[in-house]
Amino acid sequence: MDTKDLSKVQKDRNVKLEKLRSEGFDYPNDFEKKYDISYLVEKFGNFSKSELENKNQMASNAGRVVLKREMGKVVFITIEDFSGRIQAYFSKNNLEERLEEVKDLDLGDIVCIEGILFRTKTDELTIEVKDFKLLTKSTTCPWVYLGPIKETKRQITPLNLYPSQ
């Protein structure tokens, strides 16, 4: 791949991809999703914090990373599938040395997560991640300049640029 025309962000993403490949990353396809994100939100969205704690509801889902916030020993990531969005909470207590892998995730990557549903201090429905797996590494930025509108009008753009309503 000719890297002279790539942006710094794309170069960094390609370096991360090469690192993954050298570690044996092989685009796993063994994940089986039980429910769509919209199902989890509809079924458990009205549960209170204590009800979710008592229920101890496991959730596993896959989606595209559309938002990431790092806060020291925890990382919050919002993932999106075709049906909606949900927040995922990654903590050093649950993932130990794998938290660095989470910090290497980029917007546009596709991950599968497994964990327990809970509510945050801001009362947002969230999955407390116990295990995760990178399914696809994104090498392009979601905010890449697509060119003049005339030329790109009919092009298909990434879903995370224009999320469905």
Question: What residues fall within each predicted segment?
Answer:
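Class II aminoacyl-tRNA synthetase catalytic cores and aaRS-like
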Residues: 1-165
